[in-house]
Amino acid sequence: VAKARTKFQRAPVILIAGSEPGDTQLRTEENRDAVSAGIQNILLGATTLGLASFWSSCPRGANDDVAEFCKFPKGTHITAMIYLGHPERQAPVIERPPAKITLIAD
């Protein structure tokens, strides 16, 4: 628990991503999903640049305080706290089997 409470101090960069509520439940969900897709792209880009990355959720009960600190609009859902930095060691490259491609065409 103590390690989790101080993880923000160990990363040189923390990106906070939030999604605003929509005018309908569907738009609220679409906003959240679009932000999540963008976060995945950030993580892939960070990996490409050789950075370590970690997607974490907002601490329980802290959503409104974090959103206010970030000056996000009222009602914003904190979708991710993204920790970025240079890794202490390189992760081993995992050999993957060749992709199986199926073509369906007329």
Indicate where each model-derived feature is located:
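Glycine/small-residue-rich phosphate/adenosyl-binding loop
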Residues: V1-V35
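C-terminal helix-cap and adjacent tail motif
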Residues: I78-D106
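Short secondary-structure boundary segments
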Residues: S19, S57-C58, H86
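GST superfamily/GST-like fold recognition
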Residues: L26-E30, L51-D64
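Structural motif
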Residues: P12-L15, A52-S53, A80
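Short, electropositive alpha-helical surface patch
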Residues: V66-T79
